[in-house]
Amino acid sequence: MMGLSFPVLLLLVIGFFFGWLLLLKFKLLFISLLALILGYKSIAVFIGFNAPVSFTTQKQTGAIRVVSWNVARFIELARNNNAGSNTRKKMLALLKEQKADILCLQEFHTSENPGYYNNIRAIREELGFSYHYFPYDKDGDRNYYSSVIFSRFPIVDSALLRYPRPSQPEALVQADIQVNKDTIRVFTTHLQSQRFDKLDYARMQKIKSREDSLVYHSIPIVAKLKRGIVIRSIQADIIGEVRSNSPYPVLFTGDLNDVPNSYTYFKVRGELRDAFLEKGYGLGRTFRGLSPTLRIDYIFSDSRFSVAQFKREKKNYSDHYMLVADLQLNNP
C-alpha cells in the first residue's frame, strides 16, 4: 500500500527539501536529499521525463502499432438500436482511428445472443482485423467476457494461463504472432481489482469530507486493498516466470490494477521497457477514478524492441484511457 501513498510522500519530501533550503537548515536538508536519493528507483518509474511530442499518425517503416485498452465491456451490453449507444460507437471509432496492428483489450465483452452486441464481429469487420484470440469465460446466456488479442498479422500459436483462485476469471492471454519473418510473443491480462462497490466509494467520499469516523470507514477499504495486493503479487510472480521463458521477443500489455511503485509492477516488468517511460511525460494517469496519479495500465516490451512513440488517448469513454505505442523490432 506504500505505492498508493507514494505521491503524497514524494510531495512532502520535496516540500521539506525546499523548506529546509530556504531556512538554511543544512542537516535537515541533507536528510530530505538522502530520502530522494534512496527513493530514486520509485521516482524514476513514477514520472515520465520526456519532452511532450505530438504523436504522428503515419507510422515509420517497419513499426508495429500496439493499442492496449480496458474497454469496461464497451459500457453497454444489450442492444438499444442497431449500432449501439453514442459511447460504444465512439469507442469503436476511436479504435479504428489508431490504425493499430495489434489490439489488446481488457474487460472485453461480446455475445452471440441477438439481444446483445457481437463486438468480436464488429472489430473484425469494421476495423479489418483478420486474426484474434479470445479465450472467454461465460457471462450469461451466449455472452462472453475476457481479455482479447486482435492482430493484422497471423497468430501462429496461442495459450491461456488461469491464475489460481480466488482470482478467477482473471487470466494471462498469450499469442505468438508472425510479423513478416519474425515471431513475437504478445501477452495481455487484467489483474485482480480492488473489488470496490458503491458502499466503498461512499465511504471514500465520507473520508474525504471528514463527515464521520475516519477509522470506521477506512477499515473495510484497507482490508480490500491488502487482499488485492496479496492476490496481484501471486499473479505477478506467475507472469514473471512465464515471460522470462519466452523464446521470442516479448510484448506485454494490460491493466495491472497497481501503480509503478508496487511489487506487481516491478515483477511483471522485469527487464522490459515501459513505453510510457521511454516516450511519455508527466504522471501518465490511465485510470480516471479515485486519484489523478493512478497509472495502472501498461505497455512493456523487451530490449529487442525500440519505442518510436507513445500516447494516451484521454477520452472519457471508458474508466481507463487507451494506450498507443509504435515499436520497432530490432535484430530479433
Question: Each PLM stretch: what is its role?
Answer:
Residues I47-V179:
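Membrane-embedded segments
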Residues M1-L22, L29-L33, L160, V230-L251, ...:
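Metal-dependent phosphoester-hydrolase catalytic domains
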Residues V71, F108, L191, D255-L256:
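Active-site metal-binding loops of divalent metal-dependent hydrolases
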Residues T57-V67, S151-D157, Q168-L214, F305, ...:
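Beta-strand-turn-beta hairpins that frame and shape the catalytic cleft
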Residues I43, L92, Y117-I120, S147, ...:
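Extracytoplasmic/secreted envelope proteins and their assembly/folding machinery
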Residues S68-R88, H109-E112, R195-G228:
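Acidic/histidine-rich helix-loop elements
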Residues L24-I47:
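Internal/C-terminal transmembrane anchor helices
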